[in-house]
Curated annotation (Swiss-Prot):
GO MF annotations in UniProt: DNA-binding transcription factor activity; metal ion binding; sequence-specific DNA binding
Subunit annotation: Interacts with VQ10.
Classification via InterPro entries: WRKY_dom, WRKY_dom_sf, WRKY_plant
Stated name of the protein: Probable WRKY transcription factor 26
Subcellular location field: Nucleus
Binding residues for Zn(2+): C142, C147, H171, H173, C259, C264, H288, H290
GO BP terms in the entry: cellular heat acclimation; cellular response to heat
Purpose: Transcription factor. Interacts specifically with the W box (5'-(T)TGAC[CT]-3'), a frequently occurring elicitor-responsive cis-acting element. Functions with WRKY25 and WRKY33 as positive regulator of plant thermotolerance by partially participating in ethylene-response signal transduction pathway.
Naturally occurring in which organism (per UniProt): Arabidopsis thaliana
Family of this protein: Belongs to the WRKY group I family.
One Pfam family, short name: WRKY
Length: 309
């Protein structure tokens, strides 16, 4: 075989040029106009791997399918979910939560802390129902001689607490230092020296006696006016003088007495009229619940609280 034949037997690769492969744009990625590769490197959308740590500012994006076209980058907003890794802040709602309802009576009573014990001695002389209010109003006056201070107390029927205390006038004396009434103590010293009975009539009465006396005060008073030269007239009952003072509008002194019968709380006060000094006015408070004691032998004469024996 000659050299020509050997040349013909060797395949000639360059004799037939293969057809060029068709070039088409990549269906997976197209550089949008106006963007550079550096812009895509900084974009968080390219780092979809779960091994990459989330950014504290951008968060994490789950793996998703991105659609592109020749005009640019198309992103399906429904497929992208933003997850914030920071814990949510729970702020108290100022609108949805109902406001707590305030108890007006309790707030007023607790803030003012009203109490009837103010250090002075009072005597209740009346009570009535005020128009426009369901709570009763009680009236008190100071028991100190020649003190005209009064007060009215409104008490809640529901809770039994004092809602309002209104004072009228001012005290012209210091507060009592003990539980004894100042007026009764002074009168007791005078009576002990004159009557010599040795009893301390200045002590406070028990709670039961005080309540019974207030109930008797609510009963209608009986006023008897007669003309006499003596101050105390004999009505059949026995009395003990426990006080005397000058009241407003009458220069003649008023004397106070109480029945000496055990368990009887009837009281009376005697004074001469301002217009007619010969006229004696006797006012009874309460009713006797016992019979008239047996009269003593001989004429009975009570003058200025003294009993003839």
């Amino acid at each position: 075989m000659g050299s020509f034949d050997r040349q013909r037997a060797v395949p000639k690769f360059k004799t037939a040029t293969p057809s060029p492969l068709p070039l088409s744009p990549s269906p997976y990625f197209t550089m949008p106009p106006g963007l550079t590769p550096a812009d895509f490197l900084d974009s968080p959308l390219l780092f979809t791997s779960s091994n990459i740590l989330p950014s504290p500012t951008t968060g994490t994006f789950p793996a998703q399918s991105l659609n592109y076209n020749n005009n640019g980058l198309l992103i399906d907003k429904n497929e992208i979910k933003y997850e914030d890794t920071t814990p949510p802040l729970f702020l108290p709602s100022m609108v949805t939560q109902p406001l707590p309802q305030l108890d007006l009576f309790k707030s007023e009573i607790m803030s003012s802390n009203k109490t009837s014990d103010d250090g002075y001695n009072w005597r209740k002389y009346g009570q009535k129902q005020v128009k426009g209010s369901e709570n009763p109003r009680s009236y008190f006056k100071c028991t100190y001689p020649n003190c005209l201070t009064k007060k009215k107390v409104e008490t809640s029927l529901v809770k039994g607490q004092m809602i309002e205390i209104v004072y009228k006038g001012s005290h012209n004396h210091p507060k009592p230092q003990s539980t004894k009434r100042s007026s009764s103590t002074a009168i007791a010293a005078h009576q002990n020296s004159s009557n010599g009975d040795g009893k301390d009539i200045g002590e406070d009465e028990t709670e039961a006696k005080r309540w019974k006396r207030e109930e008797n005060v609510k009963e209608p008073r009986v006023v008897v006016q007669t003309t006499s030269d003596i101050d105390i007239l004999d009505d059949g009952y026995r009395w003990r003088k426990y006080g005397q003072k000058v009241v407003k509008g009458n220069p003649n002194p008023r004397s106070y007495y109480k029945c000496t019968f055990t368990g009887c709380f009837v009281r009376k006060h005697v004074e001469r009229a301002f217009q007619d000094p010969k006229s004696v006015i006797t006012t009874y408070e309460g009713k006797h619940k016992h019979q008239i004691p047996t009269p003593r032998r001989g004429p009975v004469l009570r003058l200025l609280g003294k009993t003839e024996t």
